[in-house]
Amino acid sequence: MKIDSIIVAGYFVIVFIAGYFVSRHYKKASAGDFITGGRDRTWYQVAFALFAMAADPAIISLCGLGFLWGFYIIQWNSVHMWFTAWFAAMFIVPIYWRSRIVTTPEYLEKRFSLPCRSLFSLLLMAALIITLSGAVYLGALLLENFLGWPLWSSMILISAIIGFYVILGGMKTVLTMDFYQGIFVIVTLVIVIVAVVNKVGGFAVLANSSIISKAGVSIHTIVPPSDWSLTTTKFFPTQAILAWAPITGLAWLSCNFSMAQRLLAAKSEQDAQKGLLAVAILAVFYPLASFVVGCLMRIKMPDILPDEAFIKAILVMVPVGLRGILIAGLMAALLSTVDGMLTASSALFTEDFYSRIIRKDATPTELKKVVRIAEILTILLTLALIPIIRKADSVMVFIQDFYAYVFGVTIAIYLIGMFTKKVAPRSGFIAMITSVALTIALDVFSDVNFAYIGVFSFIVTIVMFFSLSVFEKQPATAVDLENLTVHTLSDAKGPWVGLKAWPGLWKWALALAASWVVFSFCWEAFMRSLANS
């Protein structure tokens, strides 16, 4: 345990020193570069930064899902990323890139109205800060469980390290740090899966298991169960995966500013597109490791709690020393997620509220100062919310419900704005508010599965928008929609606008879809061959 503590402490020291030198290098960056990252990242830098942001400590929660529901849950992640990344690269990235937005809510103002922008930005900031508090708490809990470090001291340490290099160097520093930490996270996951699989006796143990998951299917199958009931308690049956995963995946990549901020930092539109497709593959890798470990722990330790599966795997199956490296890898995932949320929430406040509403004539120097103050206040608010989060039954359930409430509504508005020329700003705002309210009511007063609630919010928003827009008077003067829809891009028109910057995009999109099918068949064949040997 002492050796592990030394390794993790050494990792924190390295991050602190690296953060200091990288921050010093970017300390004099302009206000725009401080917020956006300078728009100079190559596609692989974008991909690793996106991956580091996505691969947070929820790895532990995913392991628990694999323990309880089985390996088929990976289909959610596959559809969630592989079938939406190409869509976002083809249609959404060209619009974001040409419209030169700084935050994702800014698109809603350019396309619809300022109230739409302000509402979504406010909701997104709230979600980011709550998720940030949960991530810091979870990271400190890991250090307490694995190494015996004091909980509050660990939370303050994590916040201080991240706050130091984020506040000093801004988004450019975050992108540089996340690139290397993303690589470290991948190495960590490889070590975890190799160590656990070898310890339990190989994949044959999983293939020969007769354990039935809570979903009623074999724990090792990749085929999801079928359930047509809207009130099903199963976690992502086939119908829910096909209906909700593409919607929430597209929203997560396109509307969620903490992810889109990294796309907007690419040095070209093509780099953003390539980075998006690359992370679609990488982002399925960490659930693969988590679910395999969860399933194997169900076989070896069936009596433990699902959320203990990952922790027990490291404590029992990984030797001292190597355990410290793995914990450091988990901390890398944590830091990359937390620094991304910190920069995103402060940028949202600065761009969507301070410079747009509070002080429109703010100078670049003033904006840079405001960003730093917002980051300090966000860290303090994050720590202040942790006692409340500790009392909550499940922070992750709350966040999951929030995304069902908001992301289905928001991506519907975005898609309407991008694929139609209809100008109806009031209809957009009313549809957003009403749909969110109806979605919350449906969740509170019914037993409908949260995935179907998200689909409901998506459909209701579209129907309500077009119904209301019939009665909305069109503006007397023509509205400039240049670079705001797929029909009005300045240099690319037609259904496949993404091919303008990257003509080979369609080939890689097909390859990505084919990879999903091949992976599914190969996994099932692999399990059956081991079971029959």
Positions of the model-derived regions?
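Membrane-embedded helix-loop-helix hairpins and adjacent transmembrane boundary segments
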Residues: 1-533
